[in-house]
Regions:
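Positively charged, aromatic-accented nucleic-acid-binding surfaces
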Residues: 1-62, 81-122
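Basic, low-complexity intrinsically disordered segments
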Residues: 66-84
Length: 122
């Protein structure tokens, strides 16, 4: 299943041009030298959860974090040409994750993410 522009569909049901558009929309940004991939959407950026967890030195799998978030806060998205799928989190889910993290870097990361958000909203 692929979540593309807010709709979950079987990969075979998604036209190739839409899949490629999603893949081409993956952006890279750096926070304290660590790569964070995100997908700009109309409702704001969707950050690759594994990148966020890695940047903040979390020792938990993205699939475990996803269970603690609502469906509208975390979804599986296409991020690579070779059919790579990743759990991605929106700003609401990111805020929830960071507010319970206890990580001293959390406020700085959230501020950085809000700057990304400002640049993705039209």
């Amino acid at each position: 299943m692929v979540n593309l522009h807010g709709a979950t569909r079987k990969r075979s049901e998604v036209p190739l041009d839409q899949l490629l558009e999603s893949v081409w929309n993956v952006r890279d940004a750096r926070w304290q030298g660590k790569l964070i991939r995100y997908i700009p959407e109309n409702d704001g950026p969707w950050f690759v959860l594994a990148d966020v967890l890695g940047a903040l030195d979390y020792k938990v799998k993205p699939s475990h974090v996803k269970k603690a978030l609502r469906t509208e806060e975390c979804r599986l998205m296409e991020i690579g040409v070779k059919s790579a799928l990743a759990n991605c989190v929106n700003m609401t889910g990111l805020l929830k994750l960071l507010s319970f993290s206890g990580k001293p870097e959390a406020p700085a990361f959230l501020e950085w993410a809000r700057e990304i958000e400002k640049g993705t909203r039209g």
